[in-house]
Amino acid sequence: MDVESIVYTYHENEVTFRTMKQLKYVILATMALVLVYGFNSGAKDHFKKLKTLTQIIRLVNENYVEEVEMEEILNGAIVGLLDKLDPHSTYITEDQFESIQEQFDAEFEGIGIEFNIMDGYITVISPIPETPSSEAGLQSGDKIVRINDESAYKITQKDVFEKLRGPKGSQVEVTIRRSGTDDFSVTLTRAKIPIHSVLASFMINDEVGYIKVNRFARSTAEEIATSLYELEQEGMKEVMLDLRNNGGGMMDQAIQIVDMFVDSRDTILFTKGRIPNSNDVYYARKSRKDKDYPVVVLINRGSASASEIVSGAFQDLDRGIVVGETSFGKGLVQRQYPLNDGSAARITIAQYYTPSGRLIQRSFDNGIEDYYSDLVDEDREASDSTLAARPIFKTKQGRDVFGGGGITPDYHVKLDLDFSESTRNLLTHKDRLIFNYADELKSDVINTYSTFEKFLANFMMDQRKQKLFFKWLNNKELEFEKDERIENWSTIGNRIKAQLANAIWGKSSMYKVL
């Protein structure tokens, strides 16, 4: 039987070409396996398994009780194959490719809003400064109800990107619904929109600077260098680098950031893998002559990958103090391989090691489910604090640091998650209740406080505001006992104040409140 006769599917007596093409790839992969390995016994076993897989796909397609979407089935088979390797090798479909690539880009073309879909409409979380949306006066809380005179009700996130993004210089008309005014339309000319890695940069006091970094993308090192320079001009004598909940990104950006602070020829990182070109050592190239001030790196269990490269290098080279929780423990190097159909495979080719030789990667021997559930284990830090079973490594100056996965901080500060269930539901509610309540307070705050500094010093979430908030919350299907209201009000009140700061003065102001 030839390839063409094997790889067919029936749909109302028509051949589905795309499925036929994908099944053909399975057969061709089988042939390629034989060509690579020859006809030894191992290759014959692999050949038999691939042949079995092809037979199963054909049987499912012809006999399953309901009609199946073969593309979905085949994608699932590919994902299942990569899942068997490790938690971070992954398959990227053609549809996913563009959005995943954007995680590493420094810009896109569009109107410049951070948004969420709430009550069926695009809701502006905040306009990005110096973009068409901010220049047109869009505000946090605005709802986009029509796009080019078509209803935007129940729009999907995918459709938002398709309708609001577009080439620089092209135009889009949006109709805005704003509390207290009639609906109005604005024509926006699309532009290049920066995607910032540095969310906030400011002086905490006269000597300490603070930089919040949320990812490692193509512009991250450059953004941090700019922030450092600006803070130095304000008199900064030490810096706090906040990498909490930063899931990582581009390895080269992490290396460039460490390189700003360490001595020339210090080892920043090394990698080890099975193939020769996956083994490498990365050395510092610059002198820290103008970056010799103290550094504190903040991490938590959400700090992963490139965040662990930075925090691990600062710790091992005795260049900074690491504070917070033990980090995620993702120390696998992925290389992305483009595939002929526009999809891609991201495959682990090596492991990261810190300068002292610590492997960053946590064990995943017990499976992916345990691998991720370990992160929310409340006893994770308690067990880590004993450090009894963990290997010991030495820093550049001879201090003990601990291996075993992730970066263990020099000073452990527990993340305060001791909320009541009602408070946790409030903070994570799908309808973003904190955002909505802050949006209702926004106009009064703008009228009362002319500057953020006055707001920060004088706006208090007092007992009167507490009563008003819980009265507002009564019809939102969230119940709070009286004791819960008292015990958790400082957290809830702080989040409301921070959201107000973000809506009116931007993200740096929000982090000053938090």
Walk through the language-model features, giving the residues of each.
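Cleft-lining beta-strand/loop regions that shape enzyme active-site pockets
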Residues: 37-49, 53, 57-70, 123-126, ...
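Extended, small/polar residue-biased N-terminal targeting/export presequences
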Residues: 64-125, 171-190, 195-200, 514
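Bacterial Sec-dependent N-terminal signal peptides
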Residues: 8-46
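Polar, glycine-rich mid-to-C-terminal structural blocks
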Residues: 306, 318, 325, 329-387
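Conserved functional hotspot residues or short segments at active or partner-binding sites
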Residues: 359-360, 364-514
